[in-house]
Amino acid sequence: METYTLANGVAIPKIGFGTWQIAEGEEAYNSVSFALKAGYTHIDTAQIYGNEVSVGKAIADSNLAREDIFLTTKLWNDKHDYELAKTSIDESLERLGVDYLDLLLIHWPNPKALRENDDWKAGNAGAWKAMEEAYKEGKVRAIGVSNFMQHHLEALIETAEIVPHVNQILLAPGCNQEDLVAYCQERDILLEAYSPLGTGSIFGNEDVEAVAERNGKSVAQVALRWSLQKGFLPLPKSVTPKNIEGNLDIFDFDLSEEDMAVLDKIQGIKTQDDPDKVNF
């Protein structure tokens, strides 16, 4: 599997298997197990997904060594506090059945409960301090954030000892977030792309279908290839074996500049939810 190198030198596989909305139990276990057999070596989960136990069991039951799997989870919005985050990290490790995480993220920057008087800033700073300590202790190999816009990153970096290694945001053809992407790339913050198929909104788009036909690939494959050629790390998710396998088949072709330009300008694609206004 091809890799990117994070700012701290840690190698991270260029595509990951996302597990959002994949239910705890048989569905999560079977999906992750199949993904690992298909060739994924990067699994992305989160505390709020509720499937850490099954994800961890699938990893433990695979034929892969722990060091050959890149595992990510995320702190939920009720853990934006130093002590709560510190405890929560250990709880995730226990649920996943592992001794360390490869990547730990703050899931959202501005929980609804912390919006008054910009309390989110102190909340993020406290959680980040706990994450920095976990990083230094070897419990986590890299730390980052998710859904952070530029002003959230600026506030965090102001008090942080370690600049986030990753920012996971919604990126898909037609949802480019160019200013935020430029800000992160200038600071060597790797961009992970969740919902890299625009939560399905690219399907049925005539322009995307034309690009797919020209390249002899599926709509999903050209969207994921677009992410790679932008320098992003896509995190597709599926419970369908055919799609799980197909989403990996993106390393044997290149999109032309013309095709990339077409995908950049796609209209009507799902865009990033405003993290300052989400209802949680």
Language model region names:
Residues 24, 110-271, 275-280:
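Beta/alpha (TIM)-barrel catalytic core signal, keyed to glycine-rich beta->alpha loops juxtaposed to Asp/Glu
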Residues 85-106, 133-137:
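CE4/NodB-like, metal-dependent polysaccharide N-deacetylase domain
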Residues 66-79, 100-109, 171:
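A short, structured active-site edge motif that brings together acidic residues
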Residues 1-69, 198, 262, 278-279:
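N-terminal binding-site loop/beta-alpha segment at the start of enzyme catalytic domains
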Residues 14, 65-69, 99-103, 141-142, ...:
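Short acidic capping loops at alpha-helix termini that bridge into adjacent secondary structure
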Residues 15-26, 75-82, 115-117:
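Active-site mouth loops of central-metabolism enzymes
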Residues 7, 56-66, 93-98, 157-160, ...:
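Acidic (Asp/Glu)-rich catalytic clusters
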Residues 23-36, 81-96, 149-154, 175-176:
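Short, acidic/polar
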